[in-house]
Amino acid sequence: MLKDYLEITKPRIIIGNIILIIGSFLFSSFPFFNVFLFFFTILGTSLVIASSCIFNNLIDIDIDTKMNRTKNRVLVKNLISPTSASIFASFIGIVGFFILGLFVNILSMFLSFIGFVIYVFFYTFFLKRKSMYSTFIGSFSGSIPSVIGHTAISNSIDLFCFLLFIIFIFWQMSHFYAIAILYINDYRKANLPFFPVVKGILKTKKHIFYYITCFIIASSMLTFLGYLSYIFLLFFSFFSFYWLYISYLSIREKDDRKFSSKLFYYSIAVVILFNFLISIDFIF
């Protein structure tokens, strides 16, 4: 039973968002690191994300039954009742907001609330079944944890926040379009109008290339505007341009699944590397 409750929180999504929080928090903390603030920022944000993921699962039960990738999810198999899941999601969400507001700051709590509303209501409830641009709107919520990592320290919105926000929008679009190509048949079964379903795989591959290009440019601005060192720029550019190169090859490749899978996994490596590098950039 506990395993089922953990599963509906989508732990892998939570871990991915924690990576974003850690990177921006450690960057913004230098030269003083507050371990308690660090702990409560991660805990509060993780609980809010977990809550939003459960509500996402609840809203998508009918869709998930149609897709091979999701047909064995806990709520689809009724291992937990929708009522129990709703109560659990509401409880951990409220606790998460409370932790952020009381132990971090009101701004970070407010940002987490915005992310929650975008993901649950605008993306999952309103747009996912209606618009091929739902992924773009959903990426707004996925960029907010990185911003929260910074506002937990600064308690203000600045240019660095804006750059992080757009950097991770570009990253997410590249990442999720690769996923959409991998599972395009599932999305067709569920009648979801995701970009590759509506516009085709080739056009999606080209858009991935454009988004990665924008990601590289936006990441470089962190150096050109004085936030990060040129060592970061040099080292990270090597890996991000290789990601762009893979994307270019995928446009010409007929084996869509092979290169989309490669793009997907490499995008994970890129985001881990990015956050690792910004967290240690003070060394340089």
Curated annotation (Swiss-Prot):
GO terms for molecular function: protoheme IX farnesyltransferase activity. Keywords: Cell membrane, Heme biosynthesis, Membrane, Transferase, Transmembrane, Transmembrane helix. The chain crosses the membrane at residues 13-33, 35-55, 87-107, 108-128, 133-153, 162-182, 224-244, 264-284. InterPro entries: Protohaem_IX_farnesylTrfase, UbiA_prenyltransferase, UbiA_prenylTrfase_CS, UbiA_sf. Pathway: Porphyrin-containing compound metabolism; heme O biosynthesis; heme O from protoheme: step 1/1. Its main location: membrane. Pfam families: UbiA. One of its GO terms (biological process) is heme O biosynthetic process. It is found in: Cell membrane. GO terms for cellular component: plasma membrane. It comes from the Bacteria. It is a multi-pass membrane protein. It catalyses: heme b + (2E,6E)-farnesyl diphosphate + H2O = Fe(II)-heme o + diphosphate. It is an enzyme of class 2 (transferase). Carbon 2 of the heme B porphyrin ring is defined according to the Fischer nomenclature. PANTHER family: PROTOHEME IX FARNESYLTRANSFERASE, MITOCHONDRIAL. Converts heme B (protoheme IX) to heme O by substitution of the vinyl group on carbon 2 of heme B porphyrin ring with a hydroxyethyl farnesyl side group. Belongs to the UbiA prenyltransferase family. Protoheme IX farnesyltransferase subfamily. This is Protoheme IX farnesyltransferase. It comes from Buchnera aphidicola subsp. Schizaphis graminum (strain Sg).
